[in-house]
Regions:
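A structural alpha-helix within SAM-dependent methyltransferase catalytic domains
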Residues: 47-50, 119-123
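A short, conserved alpha-helix within the catalytic core of class I
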Residues: 108-121
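A short acidic, Gly/Pro-enriched loop at the edge of an enzyme's catalytic core
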Residues: 88-100
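Conserved class I S-adenosyl-L-methionine
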Residues: 32-41
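Helix-to-beta-strand junctions that scaffold the AdoMet/dcAdoMet cofactor pocket
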Residues: 110, 126-128
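A short beta-strand submotif of the Rossmann-like class I SAM-dependent methyltransferase core
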Residues: 102-105
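Class I (Rossmann-like) S-adenosyl-L-methionine-dependent methyltransferase catalytic domain
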Residues: 1-28, 41-52, 58-75, 80-86, ...
Length: 201
């Protein structure tokens, strides 16, 4: 397990804020919902939405999981998992989730086959009228992030992730998202300038 330190120490991102604001203003009675958050970061989503909901989270960063554990929030379950790697993930929760939040729906390290398997799993585990929500800025990547060696008196030498300026490249285009919605028989909402929302029919 990699102990890179990055997102758990960052302030809330605009992407997270957009999604939380959207859910608070567009979801009917945002209570008693089952929510899956993919890539929990600093657990901002859990902090804001957990009061009346149950949230599961997965992450590839042990530091993010350790930070989430220290919050000691009830109804918040989280574990180390690569969303592309385990296709048996959540086999016991078919048609279970009302909402899946995945800010970076696809990454450069993911092939088309793995992405399609992952998204097919998402569709299986959301219930009817369930939503898969992603950020438009998460559809493209404009920075290079890689581990660098750092030092602190607490941790001595350790690896953390650092952003470097890089070229803008689309991981998924809006057209790709529209094609995905047709392929998996989902409704797609592009009315929000910051988000893409898929809904299971």
């Amino acid at each position: 397990k990699r102990n890179f330190s990055y997102w758990e120490s960052k302030n809330v991102t605009n992407d997270e804020r957009y999604i939380v604001d959207y859910l608070n203003t567009h979801s009917e009675a945002l209570e008693n919902k089952n929510i899956l958050h993919v890539g929990i970061g600093n657990s901002y989503v859990a902090k804001k939405l957990l009061s009346y909901n149950k949230i599961d989270g997965i992450s590839l960063s042990q530091n993010e999981l350790d930070y989430a554990s220290k919050l000691n929030l009830s109804n918040y379950n989280f574990f180390f998992q690569n969303k592309y790697a385990n296709q048996n993930l959540f086999d016991d929760k078919l048609n279970f989730y009302n909402i899946i939040i995945d800010i970076n729906l696809k990454s450069f390290g993911c092939c088309e086959v793995a992405f399609n398997k992952m998204f097919k799993k998402y569709v299986k585990i959301i219930n009817k009228d369930g939503k898969i929500i992603t950020s438009r800025s998460g559809l493209k990547w404009s920075r290079i992030i890689k581990p660098v060696l750092s030092f602190s008196f607490k941790n001595f030498f350790y690896k953390r992730l650092k952003e470097f300026d890089g070229p803008v490249s689309n991981i998924l285009s809006i057209q790709n998202c529209e094609e995905i919605s047709k392929k998996f028989n989902l409704d797609i909402d592009l009315s929000d300038q910051n988000l893409v929302i898929f809904t299971k029919k």
